[in-house]
Amino acid sequence: MAKKFYVIDTSVFLSDADCLYKFENNDIIIPIKVLEEVDKHKKRQDSVGFNARMIIKHLDSLREKGSLASGVRIDKGKGILQVVTATSELPRDLDPTIPDNEILASAIKIKEDNPKKKVIVVSRDINMRVIADSIGLTAQNYITEQVVDDRNKLYSGYA
């Protein structure tokens, strides 16, 4: 199967700090606007704040391997992670000052630069997925919930 580009939205990072390791051997694109949005949540004292801090730490450790702008291998057997800026024109009806639209502009640019590869916007934000689809981008939800079929595998709250 051909490698894909997954353009990751802020909502994914804020719900799962380990998401970078869940896209198999596909490449992950992080629009720089996502990093700005994640940074706004790092001081929160809840799971969103925790995930924001953890994803920043993950990215910092990857940064030590090489340039995030040029692309860094996430892990052995995993794809390349790259941080990009929005350099593409949005459709006229979309406000370029809205963060979600800046993220979509990054996805459009990746699609323009790689016409033979599948580019997928991954977001937990329903409206962002609807807009992405409306402007010709493939979009999918990020779902990490798993069903546990054995009660003994559930965390009891104590050791």
Regions found by a protein language model. Give the residues of each.
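Non-catalytic pre-domain segments flanking phosphatase-related domains
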Residues: 1-3
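Active-site-proximal, substrate-binding regions of enzyme catalytic domains
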Residues: 5-120, 126-159
